[in-house]
Amino acid sequence: MRTCCCPFFSVRLQGLGVILLTCWIGTVKASEHRPFGIGVGLYQHRLTVEQASVDAREASLVLEALDVELQARSSELGPYDPAAGELWLSAAEQAVSLGDYQLAEQWFSAALHNLRLNEGLQSTSQLSIVEKLVTAARRNGDRAELANRVDYRFRLLGLGNPPYDETILAAADDWLAVKIELLITDTFDSRTAYELYNRADTLQSAVCDDPVWRASWCRTFSFRLLGVMSVIDWFVQPLVKDEFADSPLSTFKRHDSVWDNNPIDHKLQTLNRTIEGRARRIFEIWRNHFPADDQLRLVAADWGWVHGRRAQALSDYRELQSRHPEWFFRPVALPQQPALTPDPRLARNSEVYTVRCQVNTWGRVSEIELSPEGATGLAVARRQFREVKFRPAFDASGELVEAAFEADIVGIRD
């Protein structure tokens, strides 16, 4: 389904029928182009789990014996003895070395509980254990636990509020990264997206306005904010009047929220109608503070290319290509930066494919080949990949050329 909007009407194409719809004046159409990373994204080989140092049976026997010893020793010491916490922590590290992240998560949690009993709920000495729990939750594909742990770490470090230091800003950046990752590997949730946008916007504004932290962190938080905006831009569709809908005001959307009864969804719609203007304000900050940064110019050009400003994007691409030809030898799935990198371990269903295709001078794909043949979800992955827009390739003289693209990708399904 495609919806073509203007200020006065919209045409919905469905099968062979053409239905005229009255459009809410002032709306803009959500992006036609699927951000690379939503549904299909680059497969990160670093996500492969390392092999344990011993075979599974031997590891199981070692951990069973260790569990018995831990239960006995912790009972002797009691929950408040710091020595018990050290025992849990040492055992958890051993579980990690043997590849049992489920047990490691359980024992790290016990060590954290002991530390909180002894040093208090606000002690920053918890952070090293919390980091290990974040890693264990990701390895286990435990979305809820991962969200809880990064939220807890974020709260411990002040929720990204000033006064800033490197640790606080790094934790805020990682919190945003994980939250975006969780958002794109599950059913879209409008409340989460709206709250995430507000937090990213606050952080980006504060850091980019701060002369102390602007140079080192403004780019990072700008990328996170653009990442959230890309997700919202894809999922939120314009509000239209549809005579065939249950309600006079219905929304064609790419997720299942009940828009007419949810005020957060209406706020998200309002936000989405101003996405383009908000992106331009970010790019203006970059021009003012980082005028010589060609990588930022490339990100801005990519955004314009995806959002239909072809002439300006091509002009920027050609200027950048004259200085950085290596950026344009091959087509690049967008967005390249901010990269949306789904972790298949956090998805309910995922599958890895190898894709080969041609990318034309408009950045659209054709001749898509996905392997292995017969894999589950192949048709869905092909359709979703076709919706991704690419930065096209240029030849040495700065002319657009059709080019081949090949990569390992992961398909994420609900």
Task: Annotate the PLM regions.
Residues M1-V11:
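N-terminal secretory signal peptides that target proteins for export/translocation
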Residues Q14-W24:
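Bacterial N-terminal signal peptides
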Residues G26-A30:
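Sec/Tat signal peptide C-region and signal peptidase I cleavage site
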Residues S31-Y43, Q51-A52, A56-S60, D81, ...:
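Charge-biased low-complexity segments
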Residues Q51, G85-S97, A111, L127-R138:
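Non-membrane alpha-helical segments in proteins
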Residues V62-E76, A110-N114, T274-W286:
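Repeat-mediated protein-protein interaction surfaces in helical alpha-solenoids
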Residues L63, D67-L70, E105, L112, ...:
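Tetratricopeptide repeat
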Residues P79-E86, N114-S125, F329:
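Short, charge-rich amphipathic alpha-helical segments embedded
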